[in-house]
């Protein structure tokens, strides 16, 4: 068992975005949507199968990208992540690489660096490390690489996602310097900042 599943969470309602469409469907200056940027970079990285977890809106995906509709998306990001983890468990993959579909600035190279980080298991129990991205010396943390041994420690309710695992298992976290930015698009002001970066 060694395959990696790339997961983009795209289920949330995007309630802070005041544009005419859902934030993931907002078209950026190059004609692609916010989510298309994120998905295209994940596909370009060529790490493994890509899964987009949808909910509030259906996000268009290119051929070969899988979607998983999460009907319980209103119950928080952790429930969307749990749906992805359950899917990954059924597939039998060893790792999940995770980011959000509203992060258009994470390039393929960042995905590759997180996927390619190798470190022997640590500690008396042989725990696998949790690999997170850093950008210009600041923790992203996305993409995040999670070995299946850590999946049971992830929250299954609320809005925390993988943050609580990263916080609670800090001794296992390894940062890898990456190009790009993990800034997310939550508001129209974020779009303006993204355009000027």
Model feature map: region roles:
Residues 34-99, 109:
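Conserved N-terminal catalytic core of the sugar/cofactor nucleotidyltransferase
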Residues 74-154:
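Conserved beta-loop-beta/alpha segment of the NTase-like Rossmann-fold superfamily
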Residues 24, 49, 66, 172-174:
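Conserved beta-strand segments of alpha/beta enzyme cores
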Residues 2-6, 152-197:
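Conserved alpha/beta core of the MobA/IspD/sugar-nucleotide pyrophosphorylase nucleotidyltransferase superfamily
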Residues 29, 68-73, 176-177:
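Short beta->alpha connector loops at strand-helix junctions that form conserved
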Residues 1-54:
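N-terminal glycine-rich phosphate-binding loop and ensuing alpha1 helix
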Residues 9-11, 53, 99-101, 133-135, ...:
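Short beta-strand segments
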Residues 16, 60, 104-105:
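A short, conserved beta-strand element in the Rossmann-like catalytic core
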């Amino acid at each position: 068992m060694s395959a990696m599943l790339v997961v983009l969470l795209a289920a949330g309602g995007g309630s802070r975005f005041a544009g005419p469409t859902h934030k993931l469907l907002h078209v950026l200056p190059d004609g692609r949507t916010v989510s298309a940027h994120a998905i295209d970079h994940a596909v370009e990285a060529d790490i493994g199968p890509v899964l987009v977890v949808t909910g509030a809106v259906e996000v268009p995906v290119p051929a070969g990208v899988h979607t998983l509709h999460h009907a319980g998306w209103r119950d928080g990001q952790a429930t969307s992540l749990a749906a992805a983890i359950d899917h990954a468990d059924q597939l039998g993959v060893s790792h999940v690489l995770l980011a959000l579909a509203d992060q258009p600035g994470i390039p393929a190279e960042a995905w590759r660096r997180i996927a390619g980080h190798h470190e022997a298991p640590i500690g008396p129990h042989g725990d696998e490390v949790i690999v997170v991205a850093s950008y210009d010396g600041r923790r992203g943390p996305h993409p995040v690489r999670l070995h299946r041994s850590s999946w049971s420690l992830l929250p299954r309710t609320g809005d925390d996602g993988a943050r609580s695992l990263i916080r609670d298992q800090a001794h296992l976290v390894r940062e890898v310097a990456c190009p790009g930015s993990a800034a997310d698009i939550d508001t129209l002001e974020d779009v303006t900042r993204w355009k000027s970066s």
